Amino acid sequence: SLDIILNHNVDSLFNYQGDNVFYLSIAKQLVQLRLKLIELLINKDQQKLPHIIRQFVGLGIGLTPSGDDYLVGLMAFLLLKEHPAFAFYPDFYQGIIQSKSQTTPISAITLEKALNQEYRENMQQLIQMLVDAKETNIYPQFLEILNIGSSSGSDMLFGLRDALYLTHYFGENYVD
């Protein structure tokens, strides 16, 4: 399952196990922000959502920082038009648009595309498989995403896993 894949993946800052103080600091921030974001979504606290989303943008290292990749994975499923959490779209939009100058140009473009539900083909396929909820083996699709960049794929999958958790919380029968 996705949990097994992510728990054994050490490339993501969400799972950082090393002793680099800088990475440890970012990893701690990412985990704290992730928990806060999930809490705000569950409590439907739309007032504070843009502020938390802004803190994710640009957080991490590389061409597409971990915080950005996490948001891309989260939005891929959570902001589907028929999803009960689609009501949070304006908050994600506001948070990302206000903070896109905090990240790399390529990541800013990726985040904007994610707001429009535009993803690379393998992510689109994975989302479609999850929406269709057919009893097919999607493990190969998870692995394809996992292999994107040095940590981008695993960071996106962390976001997707949280989106699936929240979908279960909000009631998955609303997703078309």
What are these regions (language model features)?
Residues 1-176:
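Non-transmembrane, aqueous-exposed alpha-helical and coiled segments at domain scale
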